[in-house]
Amino acid sequence: SQSRLEFLRRASVMDRLSGDLCDFVLETTGSAALLRDLSRANMLLIPLDRSDEWFRFHPLFRDMLESELRKQEPAIERELNRRASDWWAGRGDWDRAINHAITCGAVGRAGELLWLGIPEYVTRGRNQTVISWLDMLGQEAVSSDAALSLTAAATNVTRGDGVMAEHWVAVARRLLEEEGAGSGELGVFLN
């Protein structure tokens, strides 16, 4: 049916699916039952657990659906990714939250999430993951967001590059002064 096809196409922004996640991101109800039905009907939806709570699309099917969504409803795709980012952030899954924020172009949100997650990434030796995200966002985005600049500074500290760390701290300080946010959470960190 058309409503199932729309559900599949819009759900394709997510690499893992659950009823709660789909209900939140797609602003609907009854997703858990629909996911179970689609999985049983062999709609290229693969269960990830014995309780049929989590699913994933076959990768090629997901790529096709996501490509279709991007062509037909680019604004909706961005909004779905924004909501998915919010859902995952609310559950402390920084990787998925950050990936969705980057995908929808929410630079400020990505910076906020990266900054919140940086202690965990640094202490677990996941500096390269953070660097990859900063590279995906690009130099211009990092240079225009205080949280991203501070995240770049932290990654440079862990790599032992004090010169670049100081550069990014200076960029963040300038941005916060321009915004008049020197007394906020990030500003307190710099003082």
Where are these regions (language model features)?
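Short alpha-helical scaffolding segments that buttress acidic/His motifs in well-ordered protein cores
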Residues: 8-12, 152, 190
